[in-house]
Amino acid sequence: MGHPHPHPYAPAELHLPGFVPLQLSQAQILVPYLATSLFLLLAVWLISGRCSRRLSDTDRWLMCWWAFTGLTHIIIEGTFVFAPNFFSNQNPSYFDEVWKEYSKGDSRYVARDPATVTVEGITAVLEGPASLLAVYAIASGKSYSHILQFTVCLGQLYGCLVYFITAYLDGFNFWTSPFYFWAYFIGANSSWVVIPTMIAIRSWKKICAAFQGEKVKTK
């Protein structure tokens, strides 16, 4: 027996009882997200320039990134984790629509794949707040700043590895077309591979330099 509203996801036999079709277009979903993200980055950049301590441009950009990634983890990913019936809501929220759209690139989200929910849950509950703490640590010049950044980056990279490896092991058949594979599955996640890698390397060097400095002092 078919669904009242056939879903657009792959594989076609995916069972989604009560599925409610998307009510917003791709543009209506992406434009507000991108506009809000740009506004956030601009706001953090401007605020970071007024900190009581002088910050380098690198630190200000890092504050922008950690604010963006922290709020993304908490708000966007958090709504996925704690709204298991987002695909069947008769009056869907904007975030329900976000995840129904993204699921065209990875149907494990709309299918509530246990591994995916687990990774996103850890990300939303632990890495989200830790990312916002990194904003404060950088602004305040806290001694734990680089250790915190390095740790969160490792968590993000581990999450990405699990995300991609489980997709491969499960058959790589979760997207509706090559466009959604490259735009959503690869493109939307690439920032959380490239940027955390760069930050982790930088923080590792800073931590090593600090330990080396302590060794010189104790000689």
UniProtKB/Swiss-Prot annotation:
InterPro entries tied to this protein: EBP, EXPERA
UniProt pathway: Steroid biosynthesis; sterol biosynthesis
Any one GO CC term of the record: endoplasmic reticulum
Residue intervals of the EXPERA domain: 58-200
Record carries keyword Transcription: no
Molecular-function annotations in GO: C-8 sterol isomerase activity; cholestenol delta-isomerase activity; steroid Delta-isomerase activity
Source species, domain of life: Eukaryota
Keywords, alphabetical: Endoplasmic reticulum, Isomerase, Lipid biosynthesis, Lipid metabolism, Membrane, Steroid biosynthesis, Steroid metabolism, Sterol biosynthesis, Sterol metabolism, Transmembrane, Transmembrane helix
Enzyme class: isomerase
Topology with respect to the bilayer: Multi-pass membrane protein
Keyword match Transmembrane: yes
Protein's cellular compartments: Endoplasmic reticulum membrane
Chief place where the protein resides: endoplasmic reticulum
Annotated catalysed reactions: lathosterol = 5alpha-cholest-8-en-3beta-ol
Residues passing through the membrane, by range: 29-49, 62-82, 119-139, 181-201
EC code: 5.3.3.5
Gene Ontology terms: biological process: sterol biosynthetic process
Family of the protein in this entry: Belongs to the EBP family.
Function statement: Catalyzes the conversion of Delta(8)-sterols to their corresponding Delta(7)-isomers.
Protein name: Probable 3-beta-hydroxysteroid-Delta(8),Delta(7)-isomerase
Lineage: Eukaryota, Viridiplantae, Streptophyta, Embryophyta, Tracheophyta
